Swiss-Prot record:
EC number: 1.3.98.5
Family label: Belongs to the ChdC family. Type 1 subfamily.
Name used for this protein in its record: Coproheme decarboxylase
Lineage per the UniProt record: Bacteria, Bacillati, Bacillota, Bacilli, Bacillales
Cofactor: Fe-coproporphyrin III
Protein's organism: Listeria monocytogenes serotype 4a (strain HCC23)
Length: 251
């Protein structure tokens, strides 16, 4: 049997995509709308406390197009904690007007090969660089791009039948492209084998949305993607600060 890749795992991730039911929201009187927005604000304040004590992260982006209107991206140290956030959010009054359109579950991962390289001889989980990758601080970048992907298992193009050494070389070459965008694009890779419909969820952040187009285009021509990758839907959006929510929901 071929050797399976080993990974280091960090925070669990939930991408929760919602569509605003504008027709139903418009029927509410302004007083009820304000009460619901205040309740949402208190919820987000509690999320900020969790973030400040280093036990999780979260961000909100406004999504373009008709796949969704919003994405709530939450990271926690366990599936139980992630589920608690999800359930609490769904119990908010405003959640009745935020219709689920898509979701994705993953866990931030780093290949054992890369983690060992970064950590040198020390325990990777104690290395600051490795920990920053596994338990990332989400950057307040203007734009987000999310997409799920898998590796092919199709005849001669079966990623999982390649020898470990060949896979490592392809990933190293692929990674060189990503590193060339350092300072322009920050990425978080979530492993989702056994968690969701694809094998990874990729989240990109940038202040220039065109960088998403550039990096994805360049990677498409790399063999690891051109020959072995399959992609799901792409979602792109703009940063939505908590204090901007009231303006968004004002009719």
């Amino acid at each position: 049997m071929n050797e399976a890749v080993k990974t280091l795992d960090g925070w669990f991730c939930l991408h929760d995509f919602r569509s605003i039911d504008w027709a139903a929201w418009r029927e509410l009187n302004p007083g009820n709308q304000e009460l619901m927005l205040n309740e949402l604000s208190h919820f987000l304040s509690d999320m900020e406390i969790t973030k400040n004590i280093g036990e999780g992260e979260h961000t909100i982006y406004s999504i373009l197009g008709q796949k969704a209107d919003l994405v709530f991206f939450t990271l926690r140290d366990s599936l139980e904690a992630l589920n608690e956030v999800e359930n609490r959010f769904n119990k908010l009054a405003i959640a009745d007007y935020l219709l689920p359109t898509y979701s994705y579950i993953s866990v931030v991962e780093l290949s054992n090969y890369l983690a060992s390289h970064m950590a040198g001889g020390e325990d990777p989980y104690q290395n600051k660089g490795v920990r920053a990758r596994l338990y990332p601080a989400l950057p307040p970048k203007k734009h987000i791009c999310f997409y799920p992907m898998s590796k092919k298992r199709d005849g001669a193009d079966n990623w999982y039948m390649l020898p470990m050494e060949e896979r490592q070389q392809l990933i190293r070459d692929h990674g060189l492209i990503g590193r060339s965008y350092a300072g322009k694009v920050q990425q978080i890779i979530g492993g989702s084998i056994g968690f969701d419909d694809y094998e990874w969820g990729v989240t990109l952040f940038s202040d220039d949305a065109l960088e998403f187009k550039r990096i994805v285009t360049e990677m498409r021509f790399d063999e690891a993607s051109a020959r072995y990758a399959e992609f799901g839907s792409f979602f792109i959006g703009n940063l939505l600060l908590s204090e901007q929510l009231s303006k968004l929901f004002t009719i």
